[in-house]
């Protein structure tokens, strides 16, 4: 079929798509590129060429193909914008790993500008700005991204930039970040953690209470924050109950992006490949550490060990933190008449008792 001019296009399409399906990426790239050059209207050639280059981790080449496809209206503009942001970030990540920081920073900043809602680009750009001795530029970039899609990894990056800052400066910078998305859940959790870090538990409860009121099944992250707060209120029994609940509470996908022993968004080339289409086509992040049930970073105050193997409510495995708590004092079970599981409204009642003056 390839030798017959009338059937060449059909044969090339079948061959290229078969090569892509069987993992012969160089062959798929060669056949689809040739077809796309011969027939600029061949949408299949664009799709196959782009997919093969992405699968082969050829980020720069894939971006060039994407630009051509956008010009020929083979891909919608918003999808092209998001895909381009992922491709630039993937290439920036590769350059960063090779120690080529200047071009990596340039690409990451462009990616964050293209898609401020793409947190991995902002986190990488902020990290590279910090390495280049430009913390103010890093802060501004995170603030812009926070206004579009607040993410716990960006909060962590921002706090890293504030390390060693005076209290007044820290307050001013955190306030500036919070104003970018004052009603966002991540903003409230960031402020609650900061209050805990300062030892102002009443203010921390004031921020946490509405979040806990809003859900009947708080996540493991919220349970751990509640446990820390109870501990600081000198309520060890309630703290242990929250630790127990944390072991079986639902995980937060975004929180799993923070590796307790490494970088946030520590993606492999295969992860970047998936992101090109997940974020590029739908605007959704992937969460490899969530999928693999990797250890979680503990939210809140100070450096703490990760929570190993946190599990969903259907699984009975308990975290090390819970086992340590139970070793100190047995925890009453819900069928004990003197005990009941803690709910969000219980915290609200505790908060009210802390904030309201005693009645005479």
Model-derived features with residue positions:
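TPR alpha-solenoid repeat register
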Residues: 11, 45, 79, 121, ...
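Inward-facing hydrophobic residues that define packing positions of alpha-helical scaffold repeats
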Residues: 32, 66, 101, 108, ...
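Solenoid-like repeat scaffolds
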Residues: 2-5, 33-40, 70-79, 108-116, ...
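Structural motif corresponding to the intra-repeat A-B loop/turn of tetratricopeptide repeats
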Residues: 22, 39, 56, 98, ...
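TPR/TPR-like (Sel1-like) alpha-helical repeat modules
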Residues: 37-38, 43, 50-74, 135-153, ...
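Residue at a conserved register position within TPR or TPR-like alpha-solenoid repeats
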Residues: 19, 53, 95, 128-129, ...
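Alpha-helical adaptor scaffolds
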Residues: 9, 13-17, 83-85, 89-93, ...
